[in-house]
Amino acid sequence: MSDEKKKKRGFFRYSVLTTSSFSSWRRSSTSGSISQSSRTTSKTTTSSSVTSSNPINAPPPTATSSSSVLPSTSSEPPPPASAPPRISIYHKMVPSKSKFRQCDVCEHIFIFDFVRKQHLDDVYACNVCGIRVHKGCLDRVKNDCKITTQYMGGILENAVIQSNKKQWEKPTTASISKSLTTSPTCSTSTTMSPAGVEKNVHKTRKLISMTTSTLDDVTTFNSEINEEMDEETVLMTWEDVTIKLTDVDVMTKIGDGRFGSVYFGGYHGNAAVRFVNMNYLSQEDRRADVFATEIVSAYKNSRHDHIALFYGYVSDPVTNTYAIVTNFYQHNTLYHRIHEQLSEDFDQSWTFQISLQICQAMSYLHKKKILHRDLRTKNILLDNPNRVVVTDFALMKLERLENPRRNCTLLIPNHWIDYLSPEIAGNLMIDWRGDVLFQHELPFSQESDVYSFGTIFFELLLRRMPTGCDSWDQKLYAKMCGQKAALQRLDAQLQKIDGKLHELLLECWSSQPEKRPSFQQIVKRITVQMPRKESNKQKRRSTAHENPLF
């Protein structure tokens, strides 16, 4: 077969060399061989090729340019510079029935032999490379079976991994340049593998192909990896979010909550300082660690447009001061706007917009494996009349509700039972033997947050609470009786809601947690049902028949 024919069919032939000690991989661009060479010139190399079709006994000279040629002692002339590299392995020939191919040795087409009524068993094919020859041409076939791209990729990948395994533990510019360059003196960029190998092997990282590179290419390699890194995985360190108590200017008190007090303060501008009560832990030495791991870590790893912007935290075990510093939002809570500003009329588009923003924030928190545990309209702040931010997440804990200790009582706010899912309400049981609550944590989950959003969605649609002014024990009893019994009194009010919204609300309020949709699914459904604003052109068209000027 001619050289052009071999090049066209893409035959690969490689000569693998081993050395007594190796530290880098080097390939001569003209001889088409890959060898392991030591940086010391005193050691000799030994040939370990599978066959002796193209032995190389002399060590390769130092490559000063891309045109250096390795000497060969074989009688076979060295391949031209344009010849593709090969590796010497045996063919695995089996009978073939292919008639629409030609012999790769004599280049005769098999169909002509079939017309001359020769036996089909006279055609043989290799299981590895797919070469097809006549039976009479088997003796003329050389042991140069074409390797597959997967096989070649495995050889090169293992070679690079073995030679750079220790260096990759602490990647540096020098270590990357050693693994990607052929020799210290090489100044040009050459390819160690065929185009097919570079295309099919390592598709996810294009620059981790078996190509040589200069120091400039190494800089590009590092920059592209940094661009591919997920920005959400680059989290702030604890030192970046630690704030000294003296650096925060605490001013006026905004309000009190179940878990602490909120103050208006200053920290490089307006800020909200939320002091968290950690007195429920009797062991004072554990308060700082629990505060950092359970509360601060959730805020530190969260960045979203509809989540309260986190500045840092204050932890001072000496003075028993633990606080979270966030951005200050001058508007009131969503509860205040829905239930206290009764004179304001809300259109349906505003309801959809606020609901969508809440679900987007909660979908982000659930993606980060963070549970809110206390999703209510009082924990949703208004940045402006049409934008909300979610706050006070990861603060809910049964031990905080039990503090200070009372006889068979629990300190809960108004309408808190309305946001509890049935599986959470079922755990609010009292141990009458010890006159205290059971010492186990409430089973909060992503589904319980979805149930809480269902109550918020009901408030946005009807501007009232689902259970009205009932006492907490009546609400808890109705919750334990099942969802259908609790919704019987709401049938008349739910008739005012659109059918699709009614269906979404009931799915969020399902008594079976596995049947509740995720926040990601709710975002898609609200986006589809959200009314679109009518453009000015459409308004003119709709009123054209009423205006005689049109």
From Swiss-Prot:
Q: Where are the zinc fingers (Phorbol-ester/DAG-type)?
A: 90-145
Q: What happens when the gene is disrupted?
A: RNAi-mediated knockdown causes sterility characterized by a lack of oocytes. In a ksr-1 n2526 mutant background, causes larval lethality.
Native species: Caenorhabditis elegans
Q: Where is this region: Disordered?
A: 21-87, 172-196, 530-550
Per the record, the domain comment is: The protein kinase domain is predicted to be catalytically inactive.
Q: What does this protein do?
A: Probable inactive protein kinase which positively regulates Ras-mediated signaling probably acting at the level of let-60/ras or/and lin-45/raf. In the germline, regulates meiotic progression during oogenesis and mpk-1 (isoform b) phosphorylation. Plays a role in meiotic recombination events. Functions redundantly with ksr-1 in the Ras-mediated regulation of larval survival, the development of excretory canal, in determining vulval precursor cell fate during vulval induction and in mpk-1 phosphorylation in somatic cells.
Question: How does this protein assemble?
Answer: Interacts with ndk-1.
The chain positions of domain Protein kinase read 248-528
Task: Mark out the compositionally biased spans (Low complexity).
Answer: 21-56, 63-75, 177-193
InterPro entries found in the cross-reference section? C1-like_sf, Kinase-like_dom_sf, PE/DAG-bd, Prot_kinase_dom, Ser-Thr/Tyr_kinase_cat_dom, Ser_Thr_protein_kinase, Tyr_kinase_AS, Tyr_kinase_cat_dom
Q: What stretches pass through the bilayer?
A: none
Q: Which PROSITE patterns match?
A: PROTEIN_KINASE_DOM, PROTEIN_KINASE_TYR, ZF_DAG_PE_2
A GO term from the CC aspect: cytoplasm
What top-level branch of life does the organism fall under? Eukaryota
- Tell me which Gene Ontology terms the entry assigns under biological process: meiotic cell cycle; nematode larval development; nematode male tail tip morphogenesis; positive regulation of vulval development; Ras protein signal transduction; vulval development
Keywords per UniProt: Meiosis, Metal-binding, Zinc, Zinc-finger
Task: State the family named in the UniProt similarity comment for this chain.
Answer: Belongs to the protein kinase superfamily. TKL Ser/Thr protein kinase family.
The record's annotation in CDD domains points to:
C1, PK_KSR
Official protein name in the record: Kinase suppressor of Ras B
Q: List the molecular function annotations (GO) for this entry.
A: ATP binding; protein kinase activity; protein tyrosine kinase activity; zinc ion binding
